Curated annotation (Swiss-Prot):
Residues 91-103, 115-128, 544-570, 594-608, 735-783, 808-817, 837-851, 1042-1055 have a biased composition (Low complexity). The gene is hep. It is an enzyme of class 2 (transferase). Residues 636-646, 1168-1178 have a biased composition (Basic and acidic residues). This is Dual specificity mitogen-activated protein kinase kinase hemipterous. Keywords: ATP-binding, Developmental protein, Kinase, Nucleotide-binding, Phosphoprotein, Serine/threonine-protein kinase, Transferase, Tyrosine-protein kinase.
Amino acid sequence: MSTIEFETIGSRLQSLEAKLQAQNESHDQIVLSGARGPVVSGSVPSARVPPLATSASAATSATHAPSLGAGSVSGSGISIAQRPAPPVPHATPFGSASASSSSSSASAFASAAPATGTFGGTYTPPTTRVSRATPTLPMLSSGPGGGLNRTRPVILPLPTPPHPPVSETDMKLKIIMEQTGKLNINGRQYPTDINDLKHLGDLGNGTSGNVVKMMHLSSNTIIAVKQMRRTGNAEENKRILMDLDVVLKSHDCKYIVKCLGCFVRDPDVWICMELMSMCFDKLLKLSKKPVPEQILGKVTVATVNALSYLKDKHGVIHRDVKPSNILIDERGNIKLCDFGISGRLVDSKANTRSAGCAAYMAPERIDPKKPKYDIRADVWSLGITLVELATARSPYEGCNTDFEVLTKVLDSEPPCLPYGEGYNFSQQFRDFVIKCLTKNHQDRPKYPELLAQPFIRIYESAKVDVPNWFQSIKDNRLRANGDPTLQRATATGSAIGSGAGSLAGSGSGSAGGAVKYGRATTYAGQSPTNPQKTIKPTQIPSYQQQQSQFFMQSATQLPQTTTTTPTATTNCFGGSGNGNGRGNGSGGSGNGSGSSSSASPLSPPSAGIGDLNRLYRKSPFMQRKLSNGSHHPHYKYNDESPKKESMFSSIGQSILRNLTTSPFSQKKHNSTATTIPLPHNNQTLITDAATAAAAAATATTPPNIAATVLTTTPTTTPTWRLPTENSQAYDSCDSSSNATTTTLNLGLSSPSPSLPRKQFPTESPTLQLTSQQQQQPQRLQPGNQSPIVLQRFYHQQNQLREKEAAERYQQQRQQPPVGVTSTNPFHSNYVPPPPSTHSTSSQSSTQSTCSQIAINPASISPSSGSGTGNMAGLGIGSAPASGLGAAGHFGAGGTGEQLQYQPLPIAAEATGTSPTLQSRSPEQQSDYGGNGNMVASKLSKLYARRQLLGQSSSSGASNSSLDGCSREQHDAGWFNTLAGAMKRQFATYVKTQLNSTATSPVASSMDRDQEPVHPQPPAYRSVVNNGSGGKSYYYRTLSAASSSSNTSQSTSPTTEPLPGGGTSSFLRRYASSGPGGSISTPPSPHILAGLDRRHRSPDPPPRYNRGQSPLLLRKNLLELSGQPPGSPLLHRRYVSASPPLPPPRRGSESVPGSPQHFRTRIHYTPEPQRRIYRTIDQ
């Protein structure tokens, strides 16, 4: 320690002693009243010293108030800090509180000014160390408690930061925390724990979190829960709280989504809201069509009112108005949601510009020169939203980046509603949009002006059936997806019939009931007992009811199939006792009617639901559809393989899209009353068809039989669905279980359900097509849509089919052909294929099931005799007359061939071959050949025709036989003869011809004519038959190979194809086309006629796993078909079982145990440059 420091400390101690001494000596002179001020004011930075003696020196004693700390005592205007006084040991660190009393004059203070105390570091020791006692000084400024009172604790005036004002966010959080865990549902408050919510599925996700569907167990209500993570991000937290704050306060606005409560937890925040069905963004993607102006009128009314409410009541601007934030529910309510980036308006202006979606952002929010904007920015967003919904595309859809969008918003003219192109918007709507999209925000109207616009005035009072429109969109989507939730009709069969239109019949008894929107079915399904039950209008959408209904329906439906009670009874939906199925026509009358009403495959007959499941279970298209009726209600895709599903989803979609839109896609069945194409009301069509079918059935069959059929259908085994009273409308396949029963019950008189259907034939197939297109367009199934997966699936299916075909062929060779003369141009002969064949391949299994069903009935039918022209005829030729008898399994009399995809051209050719063949009824038309109508039936079959598979046997069979048996039989012949053609077209043949063989209608007709008696080998029939046709067509269209001939599996009644005419389509195309005029080369089914050809883009060459190379397939094909061993075609090539496999694209794609797998492992090295074998996308 340096000498100076030592001296400093010493001097300070000395001065302290002097000060204490002076204090004690002058104690009696202290004025009590004067000294307390400084002490009391210890926490105040500058304490006022009460009036001191006029002598400035008196202030010295006042300075003893230690409590003053750093403050400056303004006694006589002199700051304590200016005094050179060593601090009291326990004084504040600032030390300025201790003042030296050694100087009695103001000058002493001045001289010591630099001193700041012990810790000040600038203390200048006084020149004199002698302390000056000041006993004579009046210490007015310090009272008894003043000065350095050792007994008084020192109050340290430590600098405490001013308490931050409570932020708006914190206040909101505090208010919200008080409400956490309290849910207000249906007017009642439930204290709820997060464990009381059961997760049902995801609804969607966005920037701030995800929205899930949950069941509130206490109230048994399904709600939507928005789950948002709580991050340390202040912006994110602010957004969450803003959203919560707005929805909690907006409970009194019917145009804003209701908040039922919230849970604020450490990791996340859950906002519980009423469940809405969907947002308009998703709706637009589903419908792929513009939203009608009437609906947009209601959307505008709701949105403008909601925005106006936010502004007027809460001073909030939404800032994110767009289709995805406008929700709709099944009751037609339209509401605004998502207030996460809403902003408070200060003086009606908002400041932040980062919030919102670029495409909907107003120009003033983008332009940096305009720092503030107001609610009119939301008006612009509303205008853009309306243009997008009205045209089904974004006005800025060409832009790839937000920057391009923003540039376009700023620099280009504002968007407007287009003219022409079928856009017929009212002038009021156009004017409204123009006002909303005024670029200069000063000229843009605010909410009061908008609410006075004629467009809003009109739709505030107009009655618009929003629920029905919304339901139709959902139904179309569900149909396309085969979505099980479209259980409406499916679940109850009758419901099916009711479809959207008839639902009324189903649950509500009145078309108008909630049911009319299609949901009713679901509910009806819930309690068969209470068909009248309508959706209960809770705030919470019917989803809550839906869940239970979903399973119940399945169960309910199943029983329906089993129930022996008459249709009326079974039909909880007012399927009405009428066997007619008109029973409530709309209701889809009972099972039977359900069946018939299910003109669309979407709605399988209710009675046959069980079988339907069975039949369709393997069909990728039908799986979902039937899931309701499935025996395992909880397993949506019964027995479906994921691979298949995925394949269908992608391929099915594309094919369906193409085919459904094409005339071919029509189902023949629809021809029944369904002639009226109801775009969205398949059910209606179905119902009509059902009614007509029922009528036809009744007419055709003896009254007692008709009644029996109707009643029994539900009861009878679903071996092959009877059309049930109305099944005529459906393919036999659809009604197969019922059909069988019915056929049997009917006895000979009405052996086949198709017979009644035949009557429908009167209507032109085209009409049916229309209906079908509408019904079928959506059978898409979600799943793995990878082309590779799908292709592999197809190839595997082809292989299976080929094997099956071979086996069947052998079996059939051994079986005597069933000779049945058939009036039908299509062969009536059905050779029942061994049931095993049907199920052999998964694809064919569905069809095969149908075909089996069809086949058995077919055999029965002919026996019944009523099946005019035999089942084989399937009522094609005679079906019109026999109606019932000909029904043929698939209700497509000999139309088995009528694969959905049968090329239209074939119909013409077939026509040439057998004009008679062309049946008026779609069912009669053969898919491939026989009829100009084939196209329609083709698609129908695609869906409903799976049933036809069996039937197609007659005409299809002939063709099919080419496919299946004849192919094998004639393979040697045609392979040898057509070696050149085969070489050129082998791959195509393998992939597509197998399918197409069945297609050639002409050949089949010729065959029919020439050899009606010969049954076709199942394999062929499979190809020919819709069996494979229905499915395979589907497949074919997707990938010709997929449906290989076996698919049909139906025993086509078709006689064996003649070598020339009967040859497989492939040969036919090449060899036959030249020689036989009669055989106009029928386009192969998968090669849709020229009309459809454009829809089918070539498949990329598939990558094969072991055993799947085309060469191997061909080898198997030739071997199976009995090709002579020395065939020039193969000989040299097949030294090894198959050519070396190409390396896999990725190691993960190789099959374990395959050569690629080994190679992958052996040659794997981390350095890419050394991957010798992996040059493909590695």
